[in-house]
């Protein structure tokens, strides 16, 4: 049984633009608010305006994002998202241990789920390394793992699919697919191979990651291949 859960990522640079874009999204199961893209990010306007489950991400520059502020300020935004009732927050696996401890403490007895994420913007590592990353995510207390690599060949995509199987055996819900043109198929197929969720961009919006497709395109593919 596949989930085919779709998350639409918002990448607008201002609060008014991001809010307006979020209200025009139809058919998404989750909306990801990229706080690192917004010039003066706020949490409450999204929570108050949207009934869709919200995922808040504040990706630092060292993991391919735009946030260049202090770790204290970044964690404060994520903690505020938890307080406001976010369904998910995304924290990088490679964040400092102190950051992990802070958010684990803040998440205690709250319903927000923690996604621990890992991104490789150049390649896809060996299967042994990738499964080791899954072990690290589970050991670090992830509710959901997120493993995103860059595919330079079909073999890279196959390895990521093997990681989905490994995570399922470990009991860790996992988001896993490949960026890049060679990995575009994985964004669709991962949902049918045990992936927890896939990511799209809104119709008419700029992509927030290489190889990303729009939600209408994704829904169309799912409809053709039920």
From Swiss-Prot:
Active site: 119 (proton donor/acceptor), 146 (schiff-base intermediate with substrate)
GO molecular function: 3-dehydroquinate dehydratase activity
Classification via InterPro entries: 3-dehydroquinate_DH_AS, Aldolase_TIM, DHquinase_I, Type-I_3-dehydroquinase
Signal peptide bounds: none
Pathway(s) of this molecule: Metabolic intermediate biosynthesis; chorismate biosynthesis; chorismate from D-erythrose 4-phosphate and phosphoenolpyruvate: step 3/7
Catalytic activity: 3-dehydroquinate = 3-dehydroshikimate + H2O
Record keywords: Amino-acid biosynthesis, Aromatic amino acid biosynthesis, Lyase, Schiff base
SUPFAM superfamilies, A to Z: Aldolase
Binding site for 3-dehydroquinate: 9, 32-34, 59, 187, 208, 212
Subunit note: Homodimer.
HAMAP family with a match to the protein in the record: AroD
Described purpose of this protein according to its UniProt entry: Involved in the third step of the chorismate pathway, which leads to the biosynthesis of aromatic amino acids. Catalyzes the cis-dehydration of 3-dehydroquinate (DHQ) and introduces the first double bond of the aromatic ring to yield 3-dehydroshikimate.
Annotated PANTHER family: 3-DEHYDROQUINATE DEHYDRATASE
Family: Belongs to the type-I 3-dehydroquinase family.
Name of this chain's protein: 3-dehydroquinate dehydratase
């Amino acid at each position: 049984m596949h989930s085919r859960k779709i998350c639409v990522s918002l990448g607008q640079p201002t609060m008014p633009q991001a809010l307006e874009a979020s209200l025009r999204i139809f058919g998404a199961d989750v909306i990801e608010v990229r706080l690192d893209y917004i010039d003066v990010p706020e949490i409450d306007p999204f929570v108050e305006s949207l009934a869709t489950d919200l995922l808040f991400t504040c990706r630092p520059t060292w993991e391919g994002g735009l946030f260049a502020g202090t770790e204290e300020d970044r964690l404060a935004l994520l903690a505020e998202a938890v307080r406001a009732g976010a369904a998910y927050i995304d924290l990088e696996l490679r964040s400092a241990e102190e950051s992990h401890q802070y958010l684990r403490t803040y998440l205690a007895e709250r319903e927000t789920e923690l996604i621990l994420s890992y991104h490789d913007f150049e390649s896809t590592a060996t299967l042994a390394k990738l499964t080791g990353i899954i072990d690290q995510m589970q050991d670090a207390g992830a509710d959901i793992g997120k493993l995103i690599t860059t595919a330079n060949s079909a073999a890279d995509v196959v390895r990521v699919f093997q990681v989905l199987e490994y995570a399922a055996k470990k009991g860790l819900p996992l988001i896993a697919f490949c960026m890049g043109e060679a990995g575009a198929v994985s964004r669709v197929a991962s949902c049918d191979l045990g992936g927890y969720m896939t990511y799209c961009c809104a119709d008419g919006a700029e992509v927030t990651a290489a190889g990303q497709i729009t939600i209408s395109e994704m829904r169309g593919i799912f409809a053709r291949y039920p």
